[in-house]
Curated annotation (Swiss-Prot):
Stretch list, region Disordered: 1-72
InterPro entries referenced in this protein's UniProt entry, alphabetically: Cyclin, Cyclin-like_dom, Cyclin-like_sf, Cyclin_A/B-like, Cyclin_C-dom, Cyclin_N, Cyclins_cyclin-box
Protein name listed in UniProt: Cyclin-A1-2
Keyword terms of this UniProt record: Cell cycle, Cell division, Cyclin, Cytoplasm, Meiosis, Nucleus
Function as written in the Swiss-Prot or TrEMBL entry: Involved in the regulation of male meiosis progression.
Subunit text: Interacts with CDC20-1, CDC20-2, FZR2/CCS52A1 and FZR1/CCS52A2.
One cellular-component annotation, GO: nucleus
Tissue specificity field: Expressed in roots, stems and flowers.
Superkingdom assignment: Eukaryota
Organism name: Arabidopsis thaliana
Keyword Nucleus: yes
Polar residues bias: start-end ranges: 1-12, 39-63
């Protein structure tokens, strides 16, 4: 390990600013996330490392909590930078880029829903589990989630019948009267605010797809540490990719970009936003306050302050309602599994070739089939509200399945650990099928 590497240990903890009295939204200061490590600037090291230096192993440790000390968490990050300085090609599952424009979309049949009778839909899957849609995790362990039965009860909706999921006009959070128009606008907006599909090869020379995965894995832990909402995480990743599309960056500033984008997304999405000093602290004070503010200005100006971006999480919420159909009790396991699969897609640079709405629809498809392999995972309701037929999702679904089944590196385990908790129904421990029958996509 390099002598200049920072090591956050229990014996010599970095002093934490006294934020407990003013920032009640943050966790206990003892439960601290170690900095990203060797792909960042080092506080006491050189800001301009020699070109021949390569990434070395780094150990990150979690500090002591007030209740009991936690075991050290070490992570070996050997990213294998090539001697030529060029990033290796990102373990692409296919060299074929699927442009959004080539995907055939179904036309919404609004007249069909307008003429159909109002259907009762009392339970909303987006409201049933606060741990998914808000940053306040469930702390009442007395609540016992009801696990859906995987047996076929014979009361499934007719596959050819479209269920009106916008019939509940009494719930203002659903915006039932405007939902169709809102999501039509989001479908147009997602095309205009997508990052380049090959920016790593065209623009970047100091970073590669593996470094991007480690950064996003670290951002997942930062979001958990400060209890930020999932929407904040998805927005931060979008800002990172869009900025990297047109700006070459060295590996020493990659963490600075990531934590700055998380700060921007938190300002946009959160009610209780961590201070700039909190984001400096989470990097082990590797970066100064002024550096974060300068990077914030650079990101905002490059994005032209266009921060409203539809992410896969936006579409996933509506698609899960469509998957629920007429069920009065939402399937929490299905929701958590779909969220897990969608979040896994953030780690894979190759998944950028798929539109966010396609990723969300594919996650619902795979979650439905994983939990109910004897049923058809796609029906007329899902086809109508997602505008995707099963055949359009084949490549994306198979890539998600590969992500779910492959043994991830020890450097990117945050998402799997997150969804192995009880509040997420242990979704990460659910075994996905090894393969998918071809008739599912006919």
């Amino acid at each position: 390990m390099s002598s200049s590497s920072r090591n956050l240990s229990q014996e010599n903890p970095i002093p934490r600013p006294n934020l407990a009295k003013t920032r009640t939204s943050l966790r206990d200061v003892g439960n601290r996330r170690a900095p990203l490590g060797d792909i960042t600037n080092q506080k006491n090291g050189s800001r301009n490392p020699s070109p021949s230096s390569t990434l070395v192993n780094c150990s990150n440790k979690i500090g002591q909590s007030k209740k009991a000390p936690k075991p050290a968490l070490s992570r070996n990050w050997n990213l294998g930078i090539l001697d030529s300085g060029l990033p290796p090609k990102p373990n692409a599952k296919s060299n074929i880029i699927v442009p959004y424009e080539d995907t055939e979309l179904l036309q919404s049949d609004d007249s069909l829903l307008c003429s159909s009778p109002a259907l009762s839909l009392d339970a909303s899957p987006t409201q049933s589990d606060p741990s998914i849609s808000t940053h306040d995790s469930l702390t009442n362990h007395v609540v016992d989630y009801m696990v859906e039965s995987t047996t076929d009860d014979g009361n499934d909706d007719d596959d050819d019948e479209i269920v009106n999921i916008d019939s509940d006009l009494m719930d203002p959070q659903l915006c039932a009267s405007f939902a169709c128009d809102i999501y039509e606008h989001l479908r147009v907006s997602e095309v205009n605010k997508r990052p380049a599909l090959d920016y790593m090869e065209r623009t970047q020379s100091s970073i590669n797809a593996s470094m991007r995965s480690i950064l996003i894995d670290w951002l997942v832990e930062v979001a958990e540490e400060y209890r930020l909402s999932p929407e904040t995480l998805y927005l931060a990743v979008n800002y990172v990719d869009r900025y990297l599309t047109g700006n070459a960056i060295n590996k020493q500033n990659l963490q600075l970009l990531g934590v700055t984008c998380m700060m921007i997304a938190a300002k946009y999405e959160e009610v209780c936003v961590p201070q700039v000093e909190d984001f400096c602290y989470i990097t082990d004070n590797t970066y100064l306050r002024n550096e974060l503010l300068e990077m914030e200005s650079s990101v905002l100006n490059y994005l032209k302050f266009e921060l409203t971006t539809p992410t896969a999480k936006c579409f996933l919420r509506r698609f899960l309602r469509a998957a629920q159909g007429r069920k009065e009790v939402p399937s929490l396991l299905s929701e958590c599994l779909a969220c897990y699969l969608t979040e896994l897609s953030l780690l894979d640079y190759a998944m950028l070739r798929y539109a966010p709405s396609l990723v969300a629809a594919s996650a619902v498809f795979l979650a439905q089939y994983t939990l109910h392999p004897s049923r058809k995972p796609w029906n007329a309701t899902l086809e109508h509200y997602t505008s995707y037929r099963a055949k359009h999702m084949e490549a994306c679904v198979k890539n998600l399945l590969q992500l779910c089944n492959e043994k991830l590196s020890s450097d990117v385990v945050a998402i799997r650990k997150k969804y192995s908790q009880h509040k997420y129904k242990f979704a990460a421990k659910k075994l996905c099928p090894t393969s998918l029958p071809q008739e599912l996509f006919l």
